[in-house]
Amino acid sequence: MSGQNILKCKKCQLEITNKIITNHNSDTFHEQCFVCKLCSTPISDPYFTDKETGDFYCAKCEVIRNDQSKPLRESLGFCSLCYKYFRQNEDILTIDLERYHIGCLKCTICKKGINNEKYYREKMTSKLSNYCCEDCFEKVDKCNGCNSMTLGQTLLAMGKNYHANCFKCFKCSEIIKPNSPYSINKQTNTPSCQKCN
């Protein structure tokens, strides 16, 4: 026996001398030790692993577990980015009415996580925003109309960046839509819409 690797069961820590069961993590088990936590039947594919406890569940019992925890998951809500439900006692980052897993909210520029540190936000729609960490804020282009960052679609007019809603007529304050004609007041270097021209 010397020189051979002795395989031990991950659950009972005893040597495996007969049939070896290997799970997706390459852990080895006795056949009688690799069983469902709920019903104690030997596990075959497919099976599920609880990420928090490491316990294994057969497909039938996983369905039962999901049904039992559904009201709790729905009451906790879900992440505005990945749409996965929050777990009980999980840290959640809330910005306005949007809720995020801590690991989901990232800087649009450097992709580092944004936790509770200082950040900048550009609202794209009522449910979609771009975020920028403080380190990257100085690196991004700013809108010439509102002076906030431009992370999403921008309009280039008169050699400057604008949010689509910030490029406005200097006289009447109407938004000048992309590809619409406008003129530039040479004295003030400001745009005028076709009506005010």
UniProtKB/Swiss-Prot annotation:
Keyword Amino-acid biosynthesis: no
Domain of life (superkingdom): Eukaryota
Keywords on record: LIM domain, Metal-binding, Phagocytosis, Repeat, Zinc
All copies of domain LIM zinc-binding, residue ranges: 7-68, 77-139, 141-197
CC per GO annotation: phagocytic cup
Protein name (database record): LIM domain-containing protein F
InterPro entries: Znf_LIM (IPR001781)
Subunit structure: Interacts with ChLim and rab21.
UniProt key word Zinc: yes
One GO biological process term: response to imidacloprid
Species of provenance: Dictyostelium discoideum (Social amoeba)
